[in-house]
């Protein structure tokens, strides 16, 4: 895994697991709102009334509706940041 994912993946996973409403701003200025349903290396699935697949290269900013706490490295050792532990 590249260094670019060391912050991105835990952040998106926390937003997904805690079902935090997010606003996603695209590079063209469009604002999308919903909850992160899933994500991979290239896309984010955003669920609102419908699911939208948004390519990460089109995303400028992800703004959560409330503050989120990222898991610390010690949490990861205990498996708290694994996707299956929701």
Curated annotation (Swiss-Prot):
Keyword presence, RNA-binding: yes
Q: Does the keyword Acetylation apply?
A: no
Residues annotated as region Disordered? Answer: 66-86
Q: Which InterPro entries match?
A: Hfq (IPR005001), LSM_dom_sf (IPR010920), Sm (IPR047575)
Please give the biological process terms from Gene Ontology that the record holds. Answer: regulation of DNA-templated transcription; regulation of RNA stability; regulation of translation, ncRNA-mediated
Keywords assigned by UniProt? RNA-binding, Stress response
User: In Gene Ontology terms, what is one molecular function of this protein?
Assistant: RNA binding
Per the record, GO CC terms? Answer: cytosol
What job does this protein perform?
Answer: RNA chaperone that binds small regulatory RNA (sRNAs) and mRNAs to facilitate mRNA translational regulation in response to envelope stress, environmental stress and changes in metabolite concentrations. Also binds with high specificity to tRNAs.
Q: How does it assemble?
A: Homohexamer.
| Name of the protein this chain belongs to | RNA-binding protein Hfq
Gene name tied to this protein: hfq
């Amino acid at each position: 895994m590249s260094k670019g994912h060391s912050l991105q993946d835990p952040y998106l996973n926390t937003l997904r697991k805690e079902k935090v409403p997010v606003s996603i701003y695209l590079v063209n200025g469009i604002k999308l709102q919903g909850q992160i349903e899933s994500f991979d290396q290239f896309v984010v699935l955003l669920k609102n009334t419908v699911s939208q697949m948004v390519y990460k290269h089109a995303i400028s900013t992800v703004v959560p509706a409330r503050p989120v706490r990222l898991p610390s490295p010690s949490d990861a050792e205990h498996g708290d940041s694994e996707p299956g532990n929701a």
